[in-house]
Each structure stands twice: as C-alpha cells, then as structure tokens.
Amino acid sequence: MSRSIDLLKKRYLENIKENPDLFIGIELEFPIVNLEGKATDGEVVKDLFRYLPLVLGFTIEKVDDFGNPIQLLDPVSQDTILFEVAYTTIEFAFGKAKSIQEVEERFNFYMATIQNKLGEVNHAIVGCGIHPNWDKNDNQPVAYARYQMLMNYLKLSRTVLGTDLHDYPEYGAFICGSQVQLDVSKPNYLRVINAFNQIEAAKAFLFANSEFSGEDWDTKISRDIFWEESMHGIYAENVGVNARLFKDENDFF
C-alpha cells in the first residue's frame, strides 16, 4: 500500500464506526431580498444578526472585520445561522439530529422569527437558488478573510487564457444551495457513495430552482454552469459526480 493511500485511509476510515448511531445533518442557504426589487440593504441584514442573539439565545461565534456578527451559534442544539459568502445570503447549518422532523421544527421557528423581523423593513428570505436581484446587489464578499479569499480566487478566471469560462466570477455571492450529511458505517459507506452518485443527476433535475436571468442558458440548474465553467471547474475532479461506481475499498482509494 502506498504511503498516500495509507494516510487517506487513516484520515477518513478510522473514524467510521462499525455500527454507529445514525444522525442527519442539514445545511440550507437562501437569498435575503428587498421586496421593492432593489438591492438588499446591507444595514438591514447586519441589524438582523445583532437582533437574533437577543431573541433566540444564540451566541455570536464570528464577526467580520468591522465587528459585525456574521455567524451565530445555539449552544444547545449546535445550530448555526450565518452569512454565506455575501451579506445577501443566509445559511442555516443545523446540528446533528435523529430525524428531519426535528430540524424542520427548529427551522420553522427560526424562519418565522426572521421573516417577521425582515418584514418590518420590506425584506424577506425567499426560496430561490439564485438571488432574484443578483444584478442590483454589489455582490461583495463578507468582510472576512475566508470569503474574500474565495471571491479573489474566482476572479482569476478573467486571467486564464484558452478556456471557455463564464463571465460571472462574482457568482459565489448570489448562488444558494443545500447539503445533507448522513452517518455511514464501515460495512456500508461505499454502497452509500455509489448510491448517491447514481441518483445525483435525477435529484438535480427534480429539485432544480436556479434559473439565471442574465443569460439564455435554457436550464433551471444554472448552478452547475456557474461551478463547472469557473475556477472551481478548472480541475474536473472538483465538479460533477464520480465517473464510475467503485467495486471495493481498494478501487475507491
């Protein structure tokens, strides 16, 4: 066994249990929009993050370069509410739960609280994969090194010659997504990877909601284009699904 494969197995397999307790993790991202069709007001969303700890009991986990809260944590559930890349995108990253219903109950409570607050100033969270007012917002990253680094990296697409990359390197500030994490066991982890690899395309079409008004792309899955034809897609391994199913552990590694 090569040294690199040995290290990969040590890093990723040793923590997988034979028969673990099964939990689910969920992350949901949404645009915050100005209901008047204008750009999202940055002061409105920053004020929201100062308000939420007072009413939800969350602690302030991270602040931006100017001291504004950008990530909030519930010490009990470990739920996190944060800005994702830009101040116009809010993310709910839920602590591990036994069922989706547990998460749904907390999510509905958070949403009701937030929508009520935003509604006072004609703003709201909407369920779109692309920010409806992407062309009106300034699409600048949160004033935090991680997000600034990401956006600067995406801008490098304009310096890469001989490639067919799109002209929206700021897309990281206006696309939204969702993630689900499932616990696996040593006996089934490879079967789970293969299964999700096979259903990914169908899932993408069934739940597509990222239609982009800036181009005639004729698709509701523009997020794929944004990722694949950007600096993320320069290396094919960073995008798409696995090219084939894996026969066994050795084949996988």
Residue ranges of each PLM-predicted region?
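Terminal catalytic/cofactor-binding subdomain
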Residues: M1-Y168, F174
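Loop-rich catalytic cores of soluble enzymes, especially ATP-dependent carboxylate-amine ligases
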Residues: I125-V126, I130-F253
